Amino acid sequence: MTVKIYGSGGSGTVALPSSKSFTQRYILGSVFLNKSVTLNYVTITGDDSIALDIAQRAGANITMNDSSIKIRTSFTCPSDIYVGESATSYRIALGLLGSAGCITHVKGDPDLAKRPMDPLVKALEANDVHLKLNEDGFYDVDGSESKKRYIEVDGVSSQFVSSMIFYYARKGGGEFLVKNMRSPGYVYITKRVLYDLGYFVNIEKTITINPSGVWKTAIDVEPDYSSLAFFLVLGLLSENVDVRFNIKRMSRIQPDSVLLDMFKDNIAIDRDTLRVLPGIRDRITVDADHNPDLCPPISVIGIFSEHGVEIDNYARLKTKESNRYEGIIDMASRFGAIVEDNGKDLFIKRGDLKDPGTLSYTDHRMIMSAAVAAAASGFEVEIENETKVSKSFPGFFKELSKFANVSESN
């Protein structure tokens, strides 16, 4: 489906989705570790639906009521699972399946099969988990001979490290060495989830996992900072909108909470309400190694700012849901921005603003970024593939309609 966006204006409080980084970990951890829980304040994103399907195939009884998910576990190894396009569910499930001794066939979306897996495969195989690449490009798992050894894990993706933390938790505890750990903030999300599920995780160069014996049976899932970024950017760029957020349940564990530091001069906090104040006075810098999900929305600032945006270590963006490096360059150029590339970092600043016409991306974060840029530009812009935002933010366009003219395009 295609939506048409024209201009910005309006005020309101953005209803943010729950953090799928937390939700997927809670769902998968609950069923594989046999910890029955109730998750509150949950928005069912596309990725969450994938994790729930895996949980049900592994014997969980799932009851959903409004914004709560009740998970009652009775673990059994699934004969097959479907991971869709969710890298988090795929990678974490692979570790848990191997640790649990399962023999499981894995299917998923072809685009996910293209993403890197070698460091995780090597770590699991070092523990005698047998992995075989199937005809769909996914790894089938045979954990019937899996062991608990002290191994080394390449932390080029935090999901590889998180998968192995879950692996050792399922084994009753253990430790392993990590080298080259990037995006450590997401590993701390895993630490928090496992603490709530009854495990102590100590994160140093060597990561140690031990059971605590006590876990929470009811857990409140916090809203998502990476989703907040899109409306924060719109509020920064447009004086015609008054954007607010309710931050009552938001901690600083999520790595994308760095937004509160990056834009501290543009944020007013009154009790549980965060209000965005417009205006960009300096160059904005974001590191793709640490905050890859912030790069698409932050890049929109560069389109309209004379100070510009710097995206460091952009190579990380080439292996996300799409090649976001190419997507960001395309989007910025279509709006007339000046884009410079030094081979490692990307620089975007305002040029002669122009009408981009129709923008078409398949990556959920690129679609939402393009929509925000369209609203800030004042042009009438068509955005294709709007349904794909359900992967992380099902209500995005409904929320955007509080601050921009949004309509279905014929």
Swiss-Prot record:
GO molecular function, one term: 3-phosphoshikimate 1-carboxyvinyltransferase activity
Transmembrane region(s): none
PANTHER family: AROM/DEHYDROQUINATE SYNTHASE (PTHR21090), PENTAFUNCTIONAL AROM POLYPEPTIDE (PTHR21090:SF5)
Predominant place of localization: cytoplasm
Residues that hold 3-phosphoshikimate according to the record: 20-21, 25, 157-159, 183, 293, 320
Record's keyword annotation contains Cytoplasm: yes
Metabolic or biological pathway, per its Swiss-Prot or TrEMBL entry: Metabolic intermediate biosynthesis; chorismate biosynthesis
Known role: Catalyzes the transfer of the enolpyruvyl moiety of phosphoenolpyruvate (PEP) to the 5-hydroxyl of shikimate-3-phosphate (S3P) to produce enolpyruvyl shikimate-3-phosphate and inorganic phosphate.
Protein name, entry field: 3-phosphoshikimate 1-carboxyvinyltransferase
EC number(s) given by UniProt: 2.5.1.19
Subcellular localization(s) per the UniProt record: Cytoplasm
